[in-house]
């Protein structure tokens, strides 16, 4: 492959994926530069990871830099998390981090280092389309369905996609580790990172308690046969169910509704029931948790999602006269779910073929056609 020594910045996390991405690009003839981003000091093993990234860069004989973006990360991600949880939402920091932190700062650094491209170890594919001389780019799911990370890149803009290279999109995890072992990379067998790095070994509840104070409130059980479920989302554009105190019975107390998410069962600390209790809704203003018994409780499931026009992001915008058939994900590693997109007053409504479990406001829904990321939206 003749790439005429194009220069590429590779985001090095210290893990095996980004290390193999750098290795493959060097093998292809690119002028590779390794960059490690220090996000936060919150008991996160960033120092060990940075050393691994540095040692891999040394073994590949490529330049290596560490960028300290802790201030930006705090402002854009940490503060965002606290703010959203306080409002009762369940945010996804990884998606925001990719579009507003990682790819943004990689691009800025690429200008400074006169780099042609940026690259990461994400398991996604990028496809260039030439339509009558007009070039555009698509984000396609990685071939390893268990590792596909296209969900996390749903908020990238056109420039970020154009400038990006994803060397691992055509590989599965086993192949990546085999390559790492073949070339004796020190992190060939390093475990994948789990969860959000910045909270380190601290439990997420304790992380939230650092800024969000405990606030005692009541827990109300809603019976699965309650009248409020009889007409649940019968019409596509009908309003969301409004839970009220008088629709159920008080069965306990909690330490703060903002600590819980829909579908959660841990932390309720209420026994004596035949089946587990799950959070089906929360009223942040009144600090009330509504719960239901059993994983088949109708309050846990959602048939229709509304995406407000200001929360819609298109990668490959489709014209929607009335509706369009798509496949969706509302969380990472979820199998594709068949759905229909409807447009009304510039808002989008997503109607699932089968009701979905534990859909939370603040999360992202991503829609696909033939494995291509078409767009995404913040769930209202």
Curated annotation (Swiss-Prot):
The keyword tRNA processing applies. Its EC number is 2.8.1.13. GO terms for cellular component: cytoplasm. It catalyses: S-sulfanyl-L-cysteinyl-[protein] + uridine(34) in tRNA + AH2 + ATP = 2-thiouridine(34) in tRNA + L-cysteinyl-[protein] + A + AMP + diphosphate + H(+). It is an enzyme of class 2 (transferase). Pfam families: tRNA_Me_trans (PF03054), tRNA_Me_trans_C (PF20258), tRNA_Me_trans_M (PF20259). The keyword Nucleotide-binding applies. Residues 92-94 are annotated as: Interaction with target base in tRNA. ATP binds at residues 11-18, 37, 121. The record marks 122, 363 as: Interaction with tRNA. SUPFAM superfamilies: Adenine nucleotide alpha hydrolases-like. Residues 147-149, 331-332 are annotated as: Interaction with tRNA. The active site is at 97 (nucleophile), 197 (cysteine persulfide intermediate). It comes from the Bacteria. Keywords: ATP-binding, Cytoplasm, Disulfide bond, Nucleotide-binding, RNA-binding, Transferase, tRNA processing, tRNA-binding. Catalyzes the 2-thiolation of uridine at the wobble position (U34) of tRNA, leading to the formation of s(2)U34. This is tRNA-specific 2-thiouridylase MnmA. It comes from Karelsulcia muelleri (strain GWSS).
């Amino acid at each position: 492959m003749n790439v005429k020594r194009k220069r590429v910045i590779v985001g090095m996390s210290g893990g095996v994926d980004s290390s193999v991405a750098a290795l493959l690009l060097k093998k292809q003839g690119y002028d590779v530069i390794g960059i490690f981003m220090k996000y936060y000091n919150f008991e996160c093993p960033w120092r060990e990871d940075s050393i691994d990234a540095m040692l891999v860069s040394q073994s590949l004989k490529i330049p290596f830099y560490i960028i300290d973006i802790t201030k930006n990360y705090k402002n854009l991600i940490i503060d965002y998390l606290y703010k959203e949880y306080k409002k009762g939402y369940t945010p996804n920091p990884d998606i925001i981090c990719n579009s507003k932190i990682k790819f943004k700062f990689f691009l800025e650094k690429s200008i400074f280092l006169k780099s042609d491209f940026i690259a990461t170890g994400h398991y996604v594919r990028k496809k260039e389309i030439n339509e009558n001389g007009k070039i555009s780019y698509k984000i396609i799911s990685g071939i390893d369905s268990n590792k596909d990370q296209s969900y996390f890149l749903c908020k990238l803009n056109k420039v970020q996609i154009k400038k990006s290279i994803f060397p691992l999109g055509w590989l599965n995890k086993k192949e990546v580790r085999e390559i790492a072992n073949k070339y004796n990379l020190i992190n060939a067998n390093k475990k994948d990172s789990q969860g959000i790095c910045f909270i380190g070994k601290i439990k997420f509840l304790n992380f939230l308690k650092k800024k969000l104070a405990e606030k005692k409130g009541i827990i109300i059980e809603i019976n699965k046969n309650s009248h409020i479920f009889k007409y649940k989302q019968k019409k596509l554009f009908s309003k969301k169910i409004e839970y009220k105190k008088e629709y159920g019975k008080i069965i306990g107390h909690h330490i703060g509704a903002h600590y819980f998410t829909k579908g959660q069962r841990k932390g309720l600390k209420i026994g004596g029931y035949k089946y587990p209790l799950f959070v089906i809704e929360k009223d942040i203003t009144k600090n009330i948790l509504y719960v239901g018994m059993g994983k088949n409780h109708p309050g846990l499931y959602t048939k229709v999602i509304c995406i407000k026009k200001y929360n819609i992001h298109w990668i490959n915008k489709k014209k929607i006269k009335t509706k369009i058939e798509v496949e969706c994900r509302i969380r990472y590693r979820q199998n594709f779910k068949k759905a229909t997109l409807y447009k009304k007053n510039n808002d989008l409504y997503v109607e699932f073929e089968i009701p979905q479990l534990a859909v939370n406001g603040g999360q992202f829904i991503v829609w696909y056609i033939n494995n291509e990321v078409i767009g995404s939206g913040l769930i209202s």
